[in-house]
C-alpha cells in the first residue's frame, strides 16, 4: 500500500518586511510567487492545501482548497499547520512556505526517507547550514500536540520539534533551494536565480 502525502503551502502571514504585500501573490517572473511553489511540489504530493488569512478568493483561483487559521490573530505558521492537519487524511503532510520558488524536486522523497530510516515523527529540511523551520514532512496525528503547544502561548516551532523525534535532512547539494523573499531586493535576486534554474 502506497503512502498518501498531502501538502500545505503557508501563505497566512502578514509579510511585514515586504511592506505588507501578500507574499504568495507577489509577481515573480510573470507568475505569482505561490505558482512557482505549486509547480515544484505538485508532482510530489497527492493534494495541495493553501493556508491563507487574506485574499482567500484570489488564492482559490489556483484550484486548491484554501484554509484560514482556526486560531485568530495571525499566530504564525503553527496555526496554519494545525488547521491543515485537521483537513487531511494523508499519512504525511508536507509543509512549505509560499515564497520558496526553488524548492527541491526531490523534497518529499528525501524527507520521507529520513523519517523511515530513523523511525522519526517528522523531518525538517536544512540547507546544510541552517534548518528551514517551515519546510518539513510530518504525521498529521501530531496535531493535538502542536495545538496544545500553541494554546499554551508558545510560538517557536523549533521548541515544539524538541518534544518529538525529529530528524534533519540536509539539502546542501541544492544550496539555493530555500532562498525566499522577504524584501524587494531579495525578489530581484531571486528572479535572476529562477531564470537560471
UniProtKB/Swiss-Prot annotation:
Predominant subcellular localization, coarse grouping: cytoplasm
Entry's Gene Ontology cellular component terms: cytoplasm
Keyword Transferase: yes
Presence of keyword Nucleotide-binding: yes
Signal sequence region: none
Keywords: Cytoplasm, GTP-binding, Magnesium, Metal-binding, Molybdenum cofactor biosynthesis, Nucleotide-binding, Transferase
Residues binding GTP, per UniProt: 10-12, 23, 51, 69, 99
PANTHER family: MOLYBDENUM COFACTOR GUANYLYLTRANSFERASE (PTHR19136:SF81)
Protein name, entry field: Molybdenum cofactor guanylyltransferase
Species in which this protein is naturally found: Shewanella oneidensis (strain ATCC 700550 / JCM 31522 / CIP 106686 / LMG 19005 / NCIMB 14063 / MR-1)
Amino acid at each position: 500500500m502506497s503512502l498518501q502525502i498531502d501538502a500545505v503551502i503557508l501563505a497566512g502571514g502578514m509579510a511585514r518586511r515586504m511592506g505588507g504585500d501578500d507574499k504568495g501573490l507577489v509577481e515573480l517572473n510573470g507568475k505569482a510567487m505561490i505558482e512557482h511553489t505549486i509547480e515544484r511540489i505538485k508532482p510530489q504530493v497527492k493534494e495541495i492545501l493553501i493556508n491563507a488569512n487574506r485574499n482567500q478568493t484570489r488564492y482559490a483561483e489556483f484550484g486548491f482548497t484554501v484554509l484560514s487559521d482556526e486560531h485568530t490573530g495571525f499566530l504564525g505558521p503553527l496555526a496554519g499547520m494545525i488547521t491543515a492537519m485537521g483537513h487531511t487524511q494523508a499519512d504525511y503532510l508536507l509543509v512549505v512556505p509560499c515564497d520558496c520558488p526553488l524548492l527541491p524536486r526531490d523534497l518529499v522523497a528525501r524527507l520521507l526517507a529520513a523519517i523511515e530510516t530513523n523511525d522519526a515523527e517528522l523531518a525538517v529540511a536544512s540547507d546544510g547550514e541552517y534548518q528551514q523551520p517551515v519546510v518539513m514532512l510530518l504525521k498529521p496525528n501530531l496535531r493535538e500536540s502542536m495545538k496544545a503547544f500553541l494554546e499554551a502561548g508558545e510560538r517557536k516551532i523549533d521548541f515544539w520539534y524538541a518534544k518529538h523525534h525529529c530528524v534533519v535532512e540536509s539539502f546542501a547539494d541544492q544550496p539555493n533551494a530555500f532562498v525566499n523573499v522577504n524584501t524587494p531586493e531579495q525578489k530581484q535576486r531571486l528572479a535572476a536565480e529562477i531564470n537560471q534554474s
